[in-house]
């Protein structure tokens, strides 16, 4: 009877999964519908806690915002990108955005749900990116937040957890769980994105950069630099799922598509 109740409860939770459209297509035409089991509010609240945990932990080691010029540069780029996020979702410019630079040799950057950005000094020091290239990185990471890829991945993880929980209960095996804040940290810092998520972030990222007055072709030169790191293996944070050549080709196509937006926007900056 208990097993039956667990099964019914789990199936009910799965049935409650919503199909949503998180963003408008934009010029790049990203319009995939997504299945969500958890609300934006829940994920964003957990992401805010997760971000504070990560930043506070780094600050205690003296690893946050050590170089004033670096921080000013990163935040200036963020302040140009954030207003144009409204192209894809009207609520995004009003998010409680935060941008910090973390001192680490790791070539990394990320944006947690709700607009919590971190750029690592290893990325800046090792790649020596131009502003266009740095905008490409940040636009890509912001795109993950706009598309709510974090929420989608949490939903997938919870769905898998429900299924495993039912199977475990039937087998008499207890399934340990991870709280939402810990799950957000794990997915953001430790787990690579899927090919589908990376491609969407690439395409939306170049449009964000272009609309903010950054040359979208910076994404191409950035990826070429990425490919030279580690003997041709790009960093983990930009998943290796899309092959190097396919990714470059896709970036060329979509950078060209949004080039008129850049030509118009750069006159304002």
Question: Across the structure, where does each feature detected by a protein language model lie?
Answer:
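A Zn2+-metalloprotease active-site environment signal
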Residues: 2-5, 17-269
């Amino acid at each position: 009877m208990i097993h039956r109740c667990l099964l019914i409860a789990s199936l009910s939770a799965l049935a409650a999964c919503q199909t949503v459209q998180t963003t408008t297509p934009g010029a790049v035409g990203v319009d995939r519908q997504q299945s969500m089991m958890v609300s934006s509010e829940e994920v964003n609240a957990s992401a805010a806690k997760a971000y504070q945990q990560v930043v506070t932990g780094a600050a205690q080691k003296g690893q946050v915002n050590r170089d004033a010029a670096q921080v000013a540069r990163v935040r200036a780029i963020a302040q140009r990108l954030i207003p144009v996020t409204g192209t894809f979702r009207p609520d995004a410019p009003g998010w409680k955005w935060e941008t910090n630079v973390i001192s680490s040799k790791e070539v990394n950057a990320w944006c947690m749900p709700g607009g919590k950005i971190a750029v690592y000094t290893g990325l800046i020091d090792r790649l020596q990116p131009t502003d266009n290239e740095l905008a490409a990185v940040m636009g890509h990471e912001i795109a993950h937040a706009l598309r709510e890829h974090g929420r989608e991945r949490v939903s997938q993880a919870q769905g898998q957890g429900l299924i495993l929980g039912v199977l475990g209960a039937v087998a008499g095996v207890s399934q340990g769980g991870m709280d939402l804040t810990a799950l957000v940290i794990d997915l953001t810092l430790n787990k690579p994105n899927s090919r589908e998520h990376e491609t969407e972030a690439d395409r939306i990222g170049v449009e964000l950069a272009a609309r903010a007055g950054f040359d979208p072709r910076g994404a191409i030169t950035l990826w070429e630099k990425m490919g030279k790191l580690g003997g041709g293996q790009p960093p983990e944070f930009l998943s290796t799922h899309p092959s190097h050549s396919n990714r470059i080709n896709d970036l060329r196509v979509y950078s060209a598509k949004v080039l008129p937006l850049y030509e118009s926007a750069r006159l304002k900056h």
